[in-house]
């Protein structure tokens, strides 16, 4: 039986591109820029039966200021350069509800409760939920770009609560957490600090 990839015969009819970039602001904070772009490659009929031409149907930009301990969203802005209806832009300010939200396990559920309902936008919600993982990677890239001391506890590792139990490798009793705990204990032994 052929693979699903081998069954593709025509060009795409739709594309969704998600793009994330992280920019340093200062020693403790980064700005993360996210973009969601939906494009249709053929004309289509809208809900009212009107023919619409192909092209970009959604283009949404989200900017997050990330930092603090525990790691949190310190500020948030959204732009909606391309939406299918003018009314969509009324949901743009809903993103302000996430300011102060900690980046930890359960983040996606909290986002859905805050902005993923009839007061918000499904596309901005999706962008934010996917974006936070990229935000963590960007934050860590920024923090790890310079030598730093071994943390004295797991609590000193920004963003760690988001990762714990997020997948098999990052499970609470898994190899990565165990390795970090051993590194902390070894550092305490070397420096003479009581565990």
Residue ranges of predicted features:
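Generic structural signal for residues positioned in beta-strands
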Residues: 19-21, 31
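Active-site- and interface-proximal helix/loop "cap" or "latch" segments in soluble metabolic
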Residues: 3, 14-15, 22-24, 36-195
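A short hydrophobic beta-strand element
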Residues: 29-36
